[in-house]
Amino acid sequence: MITHFRQAIEETLPWLSSFGADPAGGMTRLLYSPEWLETQQQFKKRMAASGLETRFDEVGNLYGRLNGTEYPQEVVLSGSHIDTVVNGGNLDGQFGALAAWLAIDWLKTQYGAPLRTVEVVAMAEEEGSRFPYVFWGSKNIFGLANPDDVRNICDAKGNSFVDAMKACGFTLPNAPLTPRQDIKAFVELHIEQGCVLESNGQSIGVVNAIVGQRRYTVTLNGKSNHAGTTPMGYRRDTVYAFSRICHQSVEKAKKMGDPLVLTFGKVEPRPNTVNVVPGKTTFTIDCRHTDAAVLRDFTQQLENDMRAICDEMDIGIDIDLWMDEEPVPMNKELVATLTELCEREKLNYRVMHSGAGHDAQIFAPRVPTCMIFIPSINGISHNPAERTNITDLAEGVKTLALMLYQLAWQK
């Protein structure tokens, strides 16, 4: 079984990774880009050739379906997102979709049609890398995405969401999509994107919860002025204000300790030239924790601290909290089933939380959901150096296949 999956991965992963590959290494496959469209179209053809019924929904989520014989109206769904970050790796997201297809294809060959319908899903978007919106794919599955929230947004190059969508053959709906009611379970395989499994020599992670996270875009408004003729005491320097905010906040996060994490990931000073005091600086904040109350309290204090620093320095501040996701537990019964499977197969595993957000957190409050983690070499992800040992990749697909067998092929 491992040998089969290893060979299948060695053949299909480079193929799927060729769509959106950067010449200098890594991958860039942003929502509704030509690379994104080519990937979805080619994956659709490959799944159809293997005997699955394929279709796109209204926003570009791709499905490959194998109908059940006794409970065709009950769907066991598996997959992940197909988009990437800019210059990312070839495992985050897409390997979960690929693994679902490989697992279902093997199960079909070994056992024939399932009792319950099984579907592969390659979700349109999760990362928020092109447009300021996340989980567009999974939110649309449950009618949670409001078209008005994306109708007027643009990417960094000024391309509108609506136009990008049209260029790929899709039309923005006028209202939220009708939620799917037929999904009875969702299983997502994903790389850990951290170093816990590798550090402990373990090949499988059974995820019991996903951290909550808050993301901000903050804009500081001071005054641009001549760098040589403006004395230090007369400046309204937004980069200096940012540096104070960053240092103070990171030190507080360090004192708080795990599992809290805080990141200032994007900084844009203006006018961004050597001889002008920066009068405007925009930056992002990403904060995560497994406890909703701790996350809320820490970020509220962070907002208060930022305002206090800006008041002291006569700097205007605009704080936009554009993502607020609470921690999400996985389904206890599915976690128990997956844990029992790992024990039965004598897998080297651990039960753990996810420090990253995943599509599973959109599914979990609505349908029974679980996640399987596989190790990330050196804990690296969102990076061209993102890697997982081929044996661990195959072990992950095997574990997924066994889980899907229990959910869809057994009563």
Model-derived regions: residue spans:
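A short beta-alpha structural unit
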Residues: 29-32, 263-272, 284-290, 316-335, ...
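Zn-dependent metallopeptidase/amidohydrolase metal-coordination segment
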Residues: 9, 15, 22, 79-80, ...
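Midchain, well-structured core segments that form catalytic/ion-binding scaffolds
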Residues: 125-126, 130-292
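Alpha-helical metal-binding/catalytic segments enriched in His/Glu/Asp
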Residues: 78, 88-127, 214-220, 226-252, ...
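A non-catalytic alpha/beta surface segment that caps or lines the substrate-entry region
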Residues: 21-67
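Active-site metal-coordination/substrate-binding segment of hydrolases
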Residues: 44-48, 53, 63-164, 395
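N-terminal capping segment at the start of a domain
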Residues: 2-33, 124, 382
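His/Asp/Glu-rich mid-to-C-terminal helical/loop segments that flank catalytic regions of hydrolases
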Residues: 38, 210, 226, 230-256, ...
